[in-house]
Amino acid sequence: DGKITVLHLDSSTGAVDAITDEVFHRGLGSIAERSYRPHISCVKMTRDNKYLCAADLGIDYVNIYRLDHDRGVLRQVDIIRCDIDSAPRHLKFSEDGRFLYIVSEMKNCIDVYEYHEEDNVPFFDLIQTIPTSDKFEYKGVAASALNISFDGRYIITSTAGDNCVSLFEINQKTG
């Protein structure tokens, strides 16, 4: 579904307390038989804990929200507009927080973005796109997961349909 729910956690017990905000994505996707409505597949905070990034594979966006930590309220501040029919599925940030990796289910690729902030405005600049499979015909093939190795040196992705796992070395300077 296309909804993000923010929950307050009790500071002494860690237990879930009240709902502090709910945000609904709106819009239509381009693949009528598959991804025609908002469908949030992954949310991640930036490493500096300022912004929540929400991948929506139904409308091909990653919406960027500023989180008010005191009130638990989200405010949209940016949108990463992914390629049409790409279906952004999972997000991961590099250990140092400078790079965002987005694996797209239908496009079968990893998009690499450089992240920085200027004057309280987040910027995500696309710097590289890497295919997750060497197949040229993607019918029945879908990138399905993204992870970074414990030592931060490799991106690992899996692709359903051709049943493969791919490993990419991360250039620590350029992402």
Where are these regions (language model features)?
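Surface-exposed loop and turn segments in beta-propeller and other repeat-based domains
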Residues: 20-35, 79, 126-138
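Short loop/turn segments immediately following beta-strands, especially the blade-tip
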Residues: 6-16, 66-73, 113-123, 168-175
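Conserved beta-strand positions in repeat-built beta-propeller and related beta-rich domains
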Residues: 1, 46, 54-57, 94, ...
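Loop/turn-rich, solvent-exposed surfaces of beta-rich toroidal or solenoidal domains
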Residues: 141-174
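Short coil/turn segments that connect the beta-strands within blades of beta-propeller domains
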Residues: 48-50, 96-98, 151-153
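Asp-box/WD-like beta-propeller blade repeats and closely related beta-sheet repeat scaffolds
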Residues: 1-42
